[in-house]
UniProtKB/Swiss-Prot annotation:
The keyword Cell membrane does not apply. Its main location: cytoplasm. It comes from Mycobacterium bovis (strain ATCC BAA-935 / AF2122/97). It is found in: Cytoplasm. The keyword Nuclease does not apply. This is Trigger factor.
Amino acid sequence: MKSTVEQLSPTRVRINVEVPFAELEPDFQRAYKELAKQVRLPGFRPGKAPAKLLEARIGREAMLDQIVNDALPSRYGQAVAESDVQPLGRPNIEVTKKEYGQDLQFTAEVDIRPKISLPDLSALTVSVDPIEIGEDDVDAELQSLRTRFGTLTAVDRPVAVGDVVSIDLSATVDGEDIPNAAAEGLSHEVGSGRLIAGLDDAVVGLSADESRVFTAKLAAGEHAGQEAQVTVTVRSVKERELPEPDDEFAQLASEFDSIDELRASLSDQVRQAKRAQQAEQIRNATIDALLEQVDVPLPESYVQAQFDSVLHSALSGLNHDEARFNELLVEQGSSRAAFDAEARTASEKDVKRQLLLDALADELQVQVGQDDLTERLVTTSRQYGIEPQQLFGYLQERNQLPTMFADVRRELAIRAAVEAATVTDSDGNTIDTSEFFGKRVSAGEAEEAEPADEGAARAASDEATT
């Protein structure tokens, strides 16, 4: 088999393939064997009919069509493997010559990962916000802790912000009751902003068994986005009593003996949280700095696939009713054209980031090991509250292991870029990033997830590189 590659653009190629007819002989033999099992010819046992008679029964051209259709995927894959292109998505294949006894010729046009010239990472400079911790931050954490240990006491007075109320809700649209919007005995903390927009303002000042009607847009269901008349009835009012922030509370809520020790611990927690936020800021700033210096050509089909995914997610809550989706956008002061423009811009940026990090991983020869996949499995399984083995099975069943593999590889690439760059805060202080991205899972967790990850490493790596 011979193949050549034509560069149609930085992101698209045409692969010209010529397959000698003799190389199709094994394909013919396999097809004849399968047909012999299916076609009954007088005088021959099942599976024993000669190829010539089968060909006469089916027709030479029909046989050739079947052989070519079956052979195209493997011959295309072979041509890709023999070239240095990295396809993105499905190819557009056109058979240009198909005659019995003659060489098979076809072309395959496909988008590819573009070649990207990367800058010197050691010359990269990144600046982010400094970490600042004030007493207000610690006070907020302490207040949250006091709330967790607070007690609720029934009170006979109108509702105030901070109270916890039991409420009934019902709604109508144009005078029609909406059954799915009705609920009884809901517990709600006034001022939290949860449940329905406008609810907090509506209940403030009401006493038990009093009602009020307010207007709100429904968030889900067949009336999603429509204005509804919502009736809220308060059934009970409870006041949250918070413990005093003293040494006794510190001993109740923590392992510390004094409130000062507890505040110091909360300050450390705030610092760790802000360090995590800073690490994410550094990561994004590093990618943005690279994108400013690098030209990343965009494969149109890849961008379109990303855009289609965004649109699919947006429509999923409306049963993929595009007409209703367009109406909802107008009601929100937007339009379908504006949504499409924003979604395409976001899709283009996302594709640029992916292609940049893939090129960076290639340049740095990033290798994804079992420990890297274990770390991702353990971290992700914690977020969902499931076991690593269970997550692995879920990903494997849905063929999402290659996606996880690619994500881990990109993350390792950006870690390497951050380590090579000079990172400072806006005050000019150099930031040590060595502790930001290098945390490994414990030996026990790794051992627990190890059987899954051996399979993950093999399956994901194999599929991601095909």
